[in-house]
Amino acid sequence: MRDILFAAADIWMIAVGLICGVKVIRGQHNYLIGLEWIIMGVSGSNFLVYGVTKAGPDSLTHHIAFFLDAFSRSIGFTLILVLGLLVVTHRYKPTLRVEVGAFSLAAVLGFVLSEFADEIGTPGKVFFLITALATSGFLSYFAWRLREIGERAHAVWLLGATALNVVVASIYDFWRIPGDDADHTRFYILALFTWGLAMLVIYRAYAAFAAHDKRVGAGPDPVTPAPGIEIA
């Protein structure tokens, strides 16, 4: 039963990541969120193969799984996500240089934090937790903004998904779920379901916010854009 639930949770995350990733690129032209969602979908696909084949720690799928996990936990589902949401919350559009730089930084940190995890030790785990909590803070702000524009249902769903994400991030490297097996199957069932839910909820909330901006004819704020950022 655990294996079935694990596969179902993973397939759920894969489907949400790939489908919503493509939709946010095609419909919203937001490559930051879209590509990160697709990367998480690919990560889930690789993790499914890794789990089904029972590949060992020396396998290619193992190294890819740890790299993509570190990629998203360090910069992808944190800084890149926040930059993508700023497009609707603050009407900014990151330049190509910012987009390429963000993904490049995520790739570098993903490699370092996955390949040298044992050498880095606890500081790396704390870094992942801090980035997750900081991102959750911004998502809470995003939920408040949604409430302010009348999208209360989206705000509630976002707060719920964010709360689950905080739980996952808090126990990821620091606490073992009672009764879990050596492969942490129960944890990954919870984590994969949570990440899929978070991506779906954020995608729908983003689309609702973008639609609101379009309805009210929101134009650029009369402020000076940050370095490397141009007004949409």
Give the residues covered by each predicted segment.
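Hydrophobic transmembrane alpha-helical segments in integral membrane proteins
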Residues: 1-16, 184
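Internal transmembrane alpha-helix with an interfacial aromatic "cap," most often the third helix
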Residues: 15-25, 50-63, 67-103
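Membrane-interfacial loop-to-transmembrane alpha-helix junctions, especially the N-terminal start
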Residues: 26-42, 93-102, 151-161, 216-217
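A generic, lipid-embedded transmembrane alpha helix
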Residues: 34-57
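Juxtamembrane "helix-exit" motif on the non-cytosolic side of transmembrane helices
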Residues: 51-60, 112-121, 170-181
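Non-cytosolic membrane-interface motifs at loop->transmembrane helix junctions
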Residues: 59-71, 121-130, 181-191
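Membrane-proximal helix-loop-helix units in multi-pass membrane proteins
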Residues: 75-148
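C-terminal transmembrane-bundle signature of multipass membrane proteins
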Residues: 81, 141-232
